[in-house]
């Protein structure tokens, strides 16, 4: 039997008060829609459609060209949204999942369990339900004395007794595909909202004595639908708990999980120590035995084994085994630090390659530089790489020694084993094994200070 899927992503999300479509708001680095698509993939649907409407082009851009979309020009309810898929799916044999694109916490395993239950029970429709402590706002699952599902009643249409029901509709269903589209033809807008409710399909099936079931979620959190920023923050907290728990089970030490932000795309090897207030985002990969200390931020970077990052920012860069960074360093995009490089406090590296065992300990800027192995960069040294229009490269050979407060004006090259004297401005290349001194000769005027206003011998 074939599986199909319809993801509902056409809503405006008015309560988000945002210029961004609701389903594109992110939870742990991925849009809500991407989380849903990832979970839906567990069913391996033969055909999958996403119903888009509000700011359709933005949503389509996230989906890419590989996934089918249909446009709901007017948002006339969930039933109307599913009707938009009729041309693609009507008449096909199989089961169809219908799920909202603003439910980022639903797990693929739960959707698979829902499908298995639907097939096993031979239902024409199966509702994914959950027990809510506070069911306000949700559609209620109404059962008869035998425990069979009779109806789904929306909050605005529920009477007092129905509002006391704790079992709620999560908005996720499995339908017999052919019967779904047959039933949709009988929907009306005779309700408090004046919309086509998808839930009315259940009443249609019950009226024709077809079997409708409900599969109860074990974890209510999975049912969370995000309609405002409060729910978005709630989803973020829950997702972070999941992500951090899995990393800890995999052998990562998080000193304070509640104060550690790790996006879902990040990979961390066992025996890594992550201190509090650390943020790890994007395609970051961290090797075993590395230590990331309090307050560090790492984005789209690959760190080898035994790397230590102390209160620093690393973006779009590659750090080999044994590299140490910080405190208060900034490794900017397109930088590569080879084995055992040391970047100390208040050092900024941008678009540069530093060879093995090279050290830049203090107060340094290295931009657009190709630096060899075992080079020492003295405190306060700067590569001057930008003339206001173009950027130029600085090349420093192996074993070179750059004296403190050297200014290297690119394009310039310092050869292997060469040395620049402290305080030098280097505007011409320095050959290998040479010493370059580029500073004014010191002049001492003995006794002259006594003539200056600051001197204690001067009258005040």
Curated annotation (Swiss-Prot):
<keyword id="KW-0460">Magnesium</keyword>
<feature type="binding site">
    <location>
        <begin position="385"/>
        <end position="386"/>
    </location>
    <ligand>
        <name>acetyl-CoA</name>
    </ligand>
</feature>
<dbReference type="Pfam" id="PF00483">
    <property type="entry name" value="NTP_transferase"/>
</dbReference>
<keyword id="KW-0548">Nucleotidyltransferase</keyword>
<keyword id="KW-0808">Transferase</keyword>
<dbReference type="InterPro" id="IPR011004">
    <property type="entry name" value="Trimer_LpxA-like_sf"/>
</dbReference>
<dbReference type="GO" id="GO:0019134">
    <property type="term" value="F:glucosamine-1-phosphate N-acetyltransferase activity"/>
</dbReference>
<feature type="binding site">
    <location>
        <position position="350"/>
    </location>
    <ligand>
        <name>UDP-N-acetyl-alpha-D-glucosamine</name>
    </ligand>
</feature>
<keyword id="KW-0511">Multifunctional enzyme</keyword>
<comment type="function">
    <text>Catalyzes the last two sequential reactions in the de novo biosynthetic pathway for UDP-N-acetylglucosamine (UDP-GlcNAc). The C-terminal domain catalyzes the transfer of acetyl group from acetyl coenzyme A to glucosamine-1-phosphate (GlcN-1-P) to produce N-acetylglucosamine-1-phosphate (GlcNAc-1-P), which is converted into UDP-GlcNAc by the transfer of uridine 5-monophosphate (from uridine 5-triphosphate), a reaction catalyzed by the N-terminal domain.</text>
</comment>
<dbReference type="InterPro" id="IPR005835">
    <property type="entry name" value="NTP_transferase_dom"/>
</dbReference>
<comment type="pathway">
    <text>Nucleotide-sugar biosynthesis; UDP-N-acetyl-alpha-D-glucosamine biosynthesis; N-acetyl-alpha-D-glucosamine 1-phosphate from alpha-D-glucosamine 6-phosphate (route II): step 2/2.</text>
</comment>
<dbReference type="GO" id="GO:0009245">
    <property type="term" value="P:lipid A biosynthetic process"/>
</dbReference>
<dbReference type="Pfam" id="PF00132">
    <property type="entry name" value="Hexapep"/>
</dbReference>
<feature type="region of interest" description="Pyrophosphorylase">
    <location>
        <begin position="1"/>
        <end position="229"/>
    </location>
</feature>
<feature type="binding site">
    <location>
        <position position="365"/>
    </location>
    <ligand>
        <name>UDP-N-acetyl-alpha-D-glucosamine</name>
    </ligand>
</feature>
<feature type="active site" description="Proton acceptor">
    <location>
        <position position="362"/>
    </location>
</feature>
<feature type="region of interest" description="N-acetyltransferase">
    <location>
        <begin position="251"/>
        <end position="460"/>
    </location>
</feature>
<dbReference type="GO" id="GO:0000902">
    <property type="term" value="P:cell morphogenesis"/>
</dbReference>
<keyword id="KW-0961">Cell wall biogenesis/degradation</keyword>
<dbReference type="GO" id="GO:0005737">
    <property type="term" value="C:cytoplasm"/>
</dbReference>
<feature type="binding site">
    <location>
        <position position="22"/>
    </location>
    <ligand>
        <name>UDP-N-acetyl-alpha-D-glucosamine</name>
    </ligand>
</feature>
<comment type="similarity">
    <text>In the C-terminal section; belongs to the transferase hexapeptide repeat family.</text>
</comment>
<feature type="region of interest" description="Linker">
    <location>
        <begin position="230"/>
        <end position="250"/>
    </location>
</feature>
<feature type="binding site">
    <location>
        <position position="102"/>
    </location>
    <ligand>
        <name>Mg(2+)</name>
    </ligand>
</feature>
<dbReference type="GO" id="GO:0071555">
    <property type="term" value="P:cell wall organization"/>
</dbReference>
<feature type="binding site">
    <location>
        <position position="439"/>
    </location>
    <ligand>
        <name>acetyl-CoA</name>
    </ligand>
</feature>
<feature type="binding site">
    <location>
        <begin position="8"/>
        <end position="11"/>
    </location>
    <ligand>
        <name>UDP-N-acetyl-alpha-D-glucosamine</name>
    </ligand>
</feature>
<dbReference type="GO" id="GO:0006048">
    <property type="term" value="P:UDP-N-acetylglucosamine biosynthetic process"/>
</dbReference>
<comment type="subunit">
    <text>Homotrimer.</text>
</comment>
<feature type="binding site">
    <location>
        <position position="332"/>
    </location>
    <ligand>
        <name>UDP-N-acetyl-alpha-D-glucosamine</name>
    </ligand>
</feature>
<dbReference type="InterPro" id="IPR005882">
    <property type="entry name" value="Bifunctional_GlmU"/>
</dbReference>
<dbReference type="GO" id="GO:0003977">
    <property type="term" value="F:UDP-N-acetylglucosamine diphosphorylase activity"/>
</dbReference>
<comment type="similarity">
    <text>In the N-terminal section; belongs to the N-acetylglucosamine-1-phosphate uridyltransferase family.</text>
</comment>
<keyword id="KW-0012">Acyltransferase</keyword>
<keyword id="KW-0963">Cytoplasm</keyword>
<protein>
    <recommendedName>
        <fullName>Bifunctional protein GlmU</fullName>
        <ecNumber>2.7.7.23</ecNumber>
        <ecNumber>2.3.1.157</ecNumber>
    </recommendedName>
</protein>
<dbReference type="GO" id="GO:0000287">
    <property type="term" value="F:magnesium ion binding"/>
</dbReference>
<feature type="binding site">
    <location>
        <position position="169"/>
    </location>
    <ligand>
        <name>UDP-N-acetyl-alpha-D-glucosamine</name>
    </ligand>
</feature>
<feature type="binding site">
    <location>
        <position position="139"/>
    </location>
    <ligand>
        <name>UDP-N-acetyl-alpha-D-glucosamine</name>
    </ligand>
</feature>
<dbReference type="InterPro" id="IPR001451">
    <property type="entry name" value="Hexapep"/>
</dbReference>
<feature type="binding site">
    <location>
        <position position="227"/>
    </location>
    <ligand>
        <name>UDP-N-acetyl-alpha-D-glucosamine</name>
    </ligand>
</feature>
